[in-house]
């Protein structure tokens, strides 16, 4: 069994939180600060930040660049959306503005922009379904009485559910696991939707459209809910071909996928079953119950976040440090950091599987550090663009000068899913840190 250790306080071109309508400026600034906080840890007693500031003649200011300099031409605009003219970049993430037929959006990272483009195409496809004869017929069928039961369930769920035989619950959910989880995450459907199999239809449509069924995009959720209710209550049936044809743009923006097993599980199983499987997997890894509970009961983590993280840790079979990473991910306090932890886990699994086997995993300065058998320590970061700032340079100096070495280390590498500024490239080089840019092309993420 691994010994849990408390973590320290703490993309390819083109993810962190995106809601509709557009966030207020204060909300955006707050979320950005939380993302930065994941990477930043300074012990004032070391004087590290001050020393770094004195040793560096210049730092990068925030960047404002033309969107055409950052985003591939094919993604600048589509049938239902248009990117804003500029991209703002702070220390780690690119910030976008998007106008669309379904309202404005502000995706605060490359990966979230890719996700939004797929979601916009999915929304358009779902709206086509609303206009179809099949949807109109299903709506009529739903109005003949099936919906009344749903309305009763929504208005008085306790008394309605109490009349359902116990055997039904074994089909629609794991009551004991739901109790262990202490409720559902902010991304999941309610009791009514689950009991009426609406959630099952939502997962099916989300899979066909290549979108995350637990997405926080409110417009997408509204459209998915509408079509899924018609399917559950009105026997709406649609062939796979009709879904795929209208979603061709999604495939172009999707790219290669890793951890397909995790993705398939999320699309196939209800949240309670995912939680049960994840709990058992954590037990087999030797993760203490108290750590597993903290992780699975953190409702900022969606079932998708949790499942991808657990499947990634399973890939690192027998490696010391997995408990520390689960404990680290359990600290997610908003959707942005939840996604960041998921992507870190994906990068670790991808590196271990396709580059070099990892022998040990530690959390240092709130950043996962992987140690290989080739005397290499590697830091894998799902960030869009690294600017050389007082904070980022301080982290780099600490990694170069005081990184713990539980295994022999002769070489330190930093892999970024995005790229780095000229100053950041030079700064890392002076510290003898090898920089690998655009790692997302070699280690693609699920978005």
Outline where the language-model segments fall.
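N-terminal secretory signal peptides that target proteins for export/translocation
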Residues: 1-26
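Bacterial N-terminal signal peptides
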Residues: 31-43
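Cationic, glycine-rich low-complexity segments
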Residues: 56-182
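Amphipathic interfacial helices
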Residues: 123-177, 184-246
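Membrane-engaging insertion elements
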Residues: 168-189, 253-294
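Acidic-basic catalytic patches of nuclease active cores, encompassing PD-(D/E)XK
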Residues: 280-367
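Conserved catalytic cores of phosphodiester-cleaving nucleases, focusing on short active-site segments
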Residues: 342-407, 412-414
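Domain-level recognition of nuclease-like catalytic cores that cleave nucleotide substrates
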Residues: 417-447
């Amino acid at each position: 069994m691994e010994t849990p250790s408390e973590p320290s306080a703490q993309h390819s071109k083109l993810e962190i939180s995106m809601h509709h309508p557009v966030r207020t400026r204060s909300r955006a600034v707050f979320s950005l600060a939380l993302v930065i906080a994941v990477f930043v840890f300074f012990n004032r007693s070391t004087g590290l930040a001050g020393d770094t500031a004195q040793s560096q003649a210049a730092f990068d200011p925030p960047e404002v660049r033309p969107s055409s300099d950052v985003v591939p031409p094919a993604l600048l605009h589509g049938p239902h959306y248009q990117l804003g003219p500029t991209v703002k970049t702070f220390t780690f993430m690119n910030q976008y503005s998007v106008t669309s037929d379904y309202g404005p959006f502000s995706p605060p990272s490359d990966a979230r922009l890719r996700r939004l483009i797929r979601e916009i195409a999915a929304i358009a496809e779902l709206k086509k379904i609303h206009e179809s004869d099949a949807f109109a017929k299903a709506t009529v069928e739903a109005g003949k009485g099936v919906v009344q039961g749903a309305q009763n369930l929504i208005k008085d769920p306790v008394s309605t559910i109490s009349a359902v035989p116990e055997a039904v619950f074994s089909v629609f959910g794991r009551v004991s696991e739901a109790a262990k989880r202490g409720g559902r995450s902010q991304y999941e459907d309610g009791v009514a939707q689950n009991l009426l199999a609406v959630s099952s239809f939502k997962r099916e449509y989300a899979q066909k459209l290549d979108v995350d069924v637990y997405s926080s995009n409110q417009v997408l959720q509204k459209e998915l809910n509408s079509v899924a209710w018609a399917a559950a209550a009105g026997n709406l049936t649609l062939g796979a071909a009709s879904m795929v044809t209208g979603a061709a743009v999604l495939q172009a923006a999707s790219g290669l996928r890793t951890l397909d097993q995790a993705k398939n599980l999320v699309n196939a199983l209800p949240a309670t079953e995912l939680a049960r499987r994840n709990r058992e997997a954590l037990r087999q890894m030797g993760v203490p119950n108290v750590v597993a509970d903290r992780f699975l009961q953190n409702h900022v983590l969606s079932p998708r976040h949790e499942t991808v993280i657990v499947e990634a840790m399973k890939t690192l079979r027998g490696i010391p440090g997995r408990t520390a990473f689960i404990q680290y991910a359990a600290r997610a306090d908003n959707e942005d950091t939840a996604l960041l932890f998921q992507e870190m886990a994906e990068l670790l699994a991808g590196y271990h599987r396709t580059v070099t086997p990892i022998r040990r995993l530690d959390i240092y300065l709130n950043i996962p550090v992987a140690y290989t058998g080739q005397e290499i320590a590697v830091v894998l970061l799902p960030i869009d663009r690294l600017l050389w700032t007082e904070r980022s340079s301080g982290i780099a100096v600490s990694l170069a000068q005081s990184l713990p070495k539980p295994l022999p280390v002769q070489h330190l590498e930093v892999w970024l899913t995005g790229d780095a500024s000229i100053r950041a490239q030079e700064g890392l080089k002076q510290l003898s840190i090898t920089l690998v840019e655009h790692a997302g092309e070699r280690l693609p993420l699920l978005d």
